[in-house]
Amino acid sequence: MALENSKKTDFADELLINAYFYTPECPDIEHLRLLSVANRWLDTDLPISDDLKDVAKLAPAEREFYRFLFAFLSAADDLVNLNLGDLSALFTQKDILHYYIEQESIEVTHSRVYSAIQLMLFGNDATARARYVASVVKDVAIDLKVSWLQAKVRECKSVAEKYILMILIEGVFFASSFASIAYLRTHNLFVVTCQSNDLISRDEAIHTNASCCIYNNYLGGFEKPAPTRIYALFSEAVNIECEFLLSHAPKSSHLLDIEAIICYVRYSADRLLGEIGLSPLFNAPKPPPSFPLAFMTVEKHTNFFERRSTAYSGTLINDL
């Protein structure tokens, strides 16, 4: 009995001591954190105003569609955080906590960029933008996503199921928006906006990979949902995402290939199922090289970062 009590004391002491310094525990999560650090960028790196000239080149239905997408994307982070809460508080591993700090930091950049693009799409008319956003956040297609998420959070029986929801939000609920924005590039429109879309979609790929890693490797104390439950959630989320696209996509636009985007959404869902050890649900083919948002590995760096100056932007004064 004395030996057993001694072991318990040693374990408690170890936990207490580890709280005071960093100890590597999650190499896969640390790898993703380092990828995020290596690919940091700022909203000030991108001259969004350069794209203002292209707003007039969109047909009215196309302009309305992209205004709608960016209104959703701008609000999405807050909607997710309000419903899923602070999942990072569940973990003691510093690798996971440090990763989430990095993710929160880049999400701030995403929010600022989306706000700038939104304003640009309204010709920098802040009043018109505010009026539009106030009405569109109540749109049926957006409300369906939010209501579905709220209902599923209420139904959640474990933290593991919340991570499935996080994987679906980051990996499915943004997919059609990212692809639709990428199609602008094929017509040489909104070059800077498309560049920001590349960066943000890559960041979200890292975030989704992190959620998959945590689900696979760091939820040992939580009951995981049955495969039938996971498939049901994936099926519902994909259907909602496809309806989201179809509800607002311009009917006669030459900019978009709606069927290709829907196929991409289904492919993304199948890929994520594979990441958590399940067979595909849709058996959707991988997008061809011509698809403007063909699947990118999160390891890929771009010349954008190689061109950035490494000099400090301010003056450092040694006042010691």
From Swiss-Prot:
Pfam families linked to this entry: Ribonuc_red_sm
Topology of this chain in the membrane: Single-pass membrane protein
Keyword set, alphabetical order: DNA replication, Host membrane, Iron, Membrane, Metal-binding, Oxidoreductase, Transmembrane, Transmembrane helix, Viral latency, Viral reactivation from latency
Binding-site residues, Fe cation 2: 107, 170, 204, 207
InterPro entries, A to Z: Ferritin-like_SF, HSV_RIR2, RNR-like, RNR_small, RNR_small_AS, RNR_small_fam
Residues that span the membrane, as ranges: 164-184
GO molecular function: metal ion binding; ribonucleoside-diphosphate reductase activity, thioredoxin disulfide as acceptor
Subcellular location: Host membrane
Enzyme Commission numbers on file: 1.17.4.1
Record field: catalytic activity: a 2'-deoxyribonucleoside 5'-diphosphate + [thioredoxin]-disulfide + H2O = a ribonucleoside 5'-diphosphate + [thioredoxin]-dithiol
Binding site for Fe cation 1: 77, 107, 110
Record family assignment: Belongs to the ribonucleoside diphosphate reductase small chain family.
Quaternary context: Heterotetramer composed of a homodimer of the large subunit (R1) and a homodimer of the small subunit (R2). Larger multisubunit protein complex are also active, composed of (R1)n(R2)n.
PANTHER family assigned to the protein according to its UniProt record, in alphabetical order: RIBONUCLEOSIDE-DIPHOSPHATE REDUCTASE SMALL CHAIN, RIBONUCLEOSIDE-DIPHOSPHATE REDUCTASE SUBUNIT M2
Known function: Ribonucleoside-diphosphate reductase holoenzyme provides the precursors necessary for viral DNA synthesis. Allows virus growth in non-dividing cells, as well as reactivation from latency in infected hosts. Catalyzes the biosynthesis of deoxyribonucleotides from the corresponding ribonucleotides.
Protein name: Ribonucleoside-diphosphate reductase small subunit
Organism listed in the record: Equine herpesvirus 4 (strain 1942)
Species lineage: Viruses, Duplodnaviria, Heunggongvirae, Peploviricota, Herviviricetes
